Amino acid sequence: MEPGAAELYDQALLGILQHVGNVQDFLRVLFGFLYRKTDFYRLLRHPSDRMGFPPGAAQALVLQVFKTFDHMARQDDEKRKKELEEKIRKKEEEAKALPAAETEKVAVPVPVQEVEIDAAADLSGPQEVEKEEPPGSQDPEHTVTHGLEKAEAPGTVSSAAEGPKDPPVLPRIQEQFQKNPDSYNGAIRENYIWSQDYTDLEVRVPVPKHVMKGKQVSVALSSGTIRVAMVEENGERVLMEGKLTHKINTESSLWSLEPGRCVLVNLSKVGEYWWSAILEGEEPIDIDKINKERSMATVDEEEQAVLDRLTFDYHQKLQGKPQSHELKVHEMLKKGWDAEGSPFRGQRFDPAMFNISPGAVQF
């Protein structure tokens, strides 16, 4: 699928929503489509059935999808709450720092002031306030020197932050990645988050809040590379770029924009194996600590039928009831039991009369 084609889905769905006018009727349209055009509402009552879902499975699937996005919404609420609290805290710190800056009469550059609030104000602010002398007793040279010392301290912190070993702000342990659905079986990196299942990968590249339309971003995918950029007036600003650690299927890979949040890129794996990293040079994750269970969504129809039959047989065996191979033979025998000319016609059919080996039945 060509980059940008995923936006067609948003436009189509938005058109439906605008036409019906409310979410309830919008959901009716979606589930009506599933009812008319798919086997979503068809019950899988027998292991030999090749279409439909076991009783309760379709409802559980809908609930699972709902819970997934409900969890994401709760995370968004928590994130907005933390951002608001952080803004309030910064404003309070700026208000406290303003009188001291006016007393010293030193113009502190804005970037330095921001770093000072984050790194130095919490640690040394109270002690410096206690040691301040009355304005009349301060020497001008001392005042200027004092201001330069304060300007250099944040720079030291900034240079330390730019070193090869950043502070442990991002989680580094796989157990922490597993707790976040966006980094499940993946990792959180400086400029993107990725997760994976048996057949696909999902990469989230954060964008500024003003990025609301697909034309404001540029995504280029090849079998071995990825590039995500933000379109600006003077060109493009690259958000993520590099060589993939494995090949992808570009025809079934796609991307979309979550307005004001991130570019969501779905990569389709060429082979069914677990990735330890998205980009070459990226710190690999510990494959032994991820969940390697294969999702039922990745199982094809034939494999799904076998799994359903084995599950059915297991529960039947626990309850002492006939298994699928026995039921199939019983059904065949029952048809001929009362047939014209049968010596058993008129007698009650008793399945217990027959001992049927599983190998005697071909599914």
Swiss-Prot record:
The keyword 4Fe-4S does not apply. SUPFAM superfamilies: HSP20-like chaperones (SSF49764). Disulfide bonds: none annotated. InterPro entries: CS_dom (IPR007052), HSP20-like_chaperone (IPR008978), NudC_fam (IPR037898), NudC_N_dom (IPR025934), p23_NUDCD3 (IPR037905). Residues 120-143 are annotated as: Disordered. It comes from the Eukaryota. Keywords: Phosphoprotein. Gene3D superfamilies: 2.60.40.790. GO terms for cellular component: cytoplasmic dynein complex. The modification Phosphoserine is found at residues 342, 357. GO terms for biological process: cilium assembly; protein localization to pericentriolar material. Residues 128-143 have a biased composition (Basic and acidic residues). Residues 187-279 form the CS domain. This is NudC domain-containing protein 3. It comes from Mus musculus.
